[in-house]
């Protein structure tokens, strides 16, 4: 019987390309008998053994075939996937729709404000000096007089804008005009004017012209409120917020040294009530942003290359693969993409209506896969990329709205404490002592919905802040950055 080990060895050597004589000599050298070797050869010859080289050729051919199949498959994958792709029906976004707003030019503060850019005077090398003067860190009387004398025309336009009953940017008055191609009004001069107005107000206060000073400071607040009550973009809303903050902080500084009568102080305090109403304006600005996004998607579908460029960037917009995928339902599903933005807007609107203490930071998680290979098979990949590029976390904007409410309440309380001190030559033990003689109700802390905090001994008004923990007030230069946003009573 032929030895199986010998058979296996000979087969192995044959597969590796050795001939019979080479195998035989090797076996003889290792002690195998010639008769056993010959018998093994005879057995093997009955079943032909294919050399290993032929098996490798077959494997190579199989690999090449698989590669070709994959390449062809990838080339035709979009068309194959497109057969199974299906966008959802047009979404119901009626809750996010905007209406056409009509404001006659003579009632519109917009047309006064746009004149500021041509007449405003603010030396660039004095920007920090202006900021320090507004913040109360320094005072340069000569420079203040220069600012006032060189900006008389600008102050006139600003006062006229404050007296107009309404504000409405004509570009966003009609929803049909709200597109990514809409020309945005430059508003930097409006923020500049709020700072210059603050300097003028502080200058008037130093001249003991307290009523004129307060009226000047409140111009910024009145204009900011009008902008917030309009159909405004988010950028306009934020500019308005800054203008109101500058004006209200200036009011607090003027009150400290004012000689106004109690009747006048009460009148100014009551006049601040209207400045709490800013939620609807913020909600409208969120709807305007959604309108931008929805119209952008429509424009991309229609082949508007300029809109595509503004969304994905100039380099990517020239990429033929991007243009090809936009026309492929699998990679770009407009209605599903609109739904992403609609839900994003609704979350922000819901947060804007919540008490400030209940607002939780919402993380905008990227939807598109970062792996290029996986992205190639990702449904609505282009839509998700557009969402990732445009959607940002707006919780901070809502927090700023809450801070604005706090600033209004703190300013209101400070004015009435001043009136109380004028009457009694003392500070109230609590804010409730101001009701009803000086206040109709105690101002609320927007972060916990309870009464604004007050300490007669520390001479401070403060909020519990975003963490809603009462730490007894905080110390610092900027109340916005404090754990307990705190306002000093400097009188």
Model-derived regions, located:
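Eukaryotic low-complexity, mixed-charge intrinsically disordered interaction/regulatory segments enriched
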Residues: 1-48
């Amino acid at each position: 019987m032929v030895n199986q080990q010998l058979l296996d060895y000979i087969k192995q050597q044959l597969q590796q390309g050795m001939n019979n004589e080479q195998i035989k000599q090797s076996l003889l050298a290792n002690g195998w008998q010639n008769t056993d070797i010959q018998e093994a050869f005879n057995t093997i010859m009955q079943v032909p053994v294919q050399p290993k080289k032929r098996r490798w050729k077959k494997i190579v051919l199989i690999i090449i075939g698989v590669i070709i199949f994959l390449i062809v498959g990838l080339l035709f994958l979009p068309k194959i996937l497109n057969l199974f792709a299906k966008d959802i029906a047009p979404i119901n976004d009626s809750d996010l729709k905007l209406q056409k707003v009509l404001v006659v030019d003579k009632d519109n503060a917009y047309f006064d404000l746009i004149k500021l850019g041509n007449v405003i005077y603010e030396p660039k090398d004095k920007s920090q000096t202006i900021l320090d003067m507004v913040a109360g860190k320094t005072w340069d009387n000569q420079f203040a007089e220069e600012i006032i004398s060189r900006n008389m025309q600008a102050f006139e336009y600003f006062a006229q804008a404050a007296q107009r009953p309404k504000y409405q940017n004509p570009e966003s008055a009609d929803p049909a005009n709200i597109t990514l191609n809409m020309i945005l009004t430059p508003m930097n001069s409006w923020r500049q004017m709020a700072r210059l107005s603050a300097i003028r107000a502080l200058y008037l206060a130093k001249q003991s012209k307290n009523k004129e000073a307060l009226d000047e400071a409140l111009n910024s607040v009145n204009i900011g409120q009008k902008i917030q009550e309009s159909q405004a973009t988010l950028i306009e809303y934020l500019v308005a917020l800054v203008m109101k903050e500058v004006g209200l902080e200036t009011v607090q500084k003027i009150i400290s040294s004012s000689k106004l009568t109690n009747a006048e102080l009460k009148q100014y305090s009551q006049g601040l009530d209207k400045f709490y109403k800013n939620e609807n304006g913020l909600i409208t600005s969120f709807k305007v942003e959604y309108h931008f996004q929805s119209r952008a998607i429509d424009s991309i579908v229609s082949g508007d290359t300029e809109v595509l460029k503004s969304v994905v960037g100039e380099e990517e917009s020239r990429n033929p693969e991007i243009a090809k995928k936009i026309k492929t339902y699998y990679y770009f599903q407009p209605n599903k993409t609109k739904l992403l933005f609609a839900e994003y807007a609704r979350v922000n609107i819901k947060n804007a209506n919540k008490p400030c203490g209940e607002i939780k930071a919402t993380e905008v998680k990227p939807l598109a896969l970062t792996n290029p290979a996986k992205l190639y098979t990702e449904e609505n990949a282009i839509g998700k990329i557009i969402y990732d590029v445009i959607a940002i976390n707006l919780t901070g904007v809502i927090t700023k709205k809450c801070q604005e409410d706090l600033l209004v309440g703190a300013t209101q309380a400070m004015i009435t404490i001043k009136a109380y001190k004028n009457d009694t030559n003392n500070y109230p033990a609590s804010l409730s002592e101001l009701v009803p003689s000086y206040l109709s109700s105690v101002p609320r802390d927007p972060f916990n919905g309870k009464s604004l905090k007050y300490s007669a001994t520390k001479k401070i008004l403060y909020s519990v802040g975003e963490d809603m923990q009462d730490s007894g007030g905080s110390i610092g230069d900027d109340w916005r950055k404090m754990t307990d946003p705190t306002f000093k009573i400097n009188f």
